[in-house]
């Protein structure tokens, strides 16, 4: 579109931002797009991302399917990057705190350096955030991060309750 080389841009940012960790969002087996890619393509993209300046790769799958995260997690660990595994927060009869805690434990066992609650729709309510963070903190040893949106106007209070519950980032 702009005729730019994204790796050049990343290296330029890294040259000017020396003491700050750079993070990218990575859609698991879909990399940055909306279709699946072969394992070797995922591995090479992770390698190039870290080699060009990315420190933290936040990897997620919209379906919370760990199978779609394994290659990216393994590749990030191989390249000595920090792999933050995110789960997509939603609400339903099966998407409860026990479900998310089990998922977080599985991500930790797969090699996650940190876990992110990815509240991409802004659905997480303040007291639900408190309970979820407490459950996660008792289930995993790695740091927990909250990423939320202001869609429902609750983000500041949700963040406050998550802090009170001990969220790390």
Name each model feature, range by range.
Residues 2-21, 31-146, 152-153, 157-169:
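Alpha/beta enzyme core
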């Amino acid at each position: 579109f702009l005729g730019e080389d994204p790796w050049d841009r990343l290296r330029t940012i890294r040259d000017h931002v020396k003491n700050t960790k750079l993070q990218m969002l990575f859609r698991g087996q879909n990399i940055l797009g909306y279709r699946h890619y072969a394992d070797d393509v995922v591995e090479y993209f992770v390698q190039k991302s870290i080699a060009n300046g990315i420190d933290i790769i936040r990897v997620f799958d919209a379906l919370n399917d760990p199978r779609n995260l394994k290659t990216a997690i393994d590749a990030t660990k191989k390249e000595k990057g920090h792999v933050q595994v995110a789960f997509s927060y939603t609400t339903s009869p099966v998407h409860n705190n026990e479900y998310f805690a089990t998922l977080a434990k599985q991500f930790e066992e797969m090699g996650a350096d940190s876990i992110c609650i990815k509240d991409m729709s802004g659905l997480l309510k303040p007291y639900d955030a408190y309970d979820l963070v407490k459950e996660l903190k008792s289930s995993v040893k790695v740091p927990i991060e909250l990423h939320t949106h202001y869609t429902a106007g609750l983000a500041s209070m949700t963040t406050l309750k998550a802090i009170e519950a001990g969220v790390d980032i």
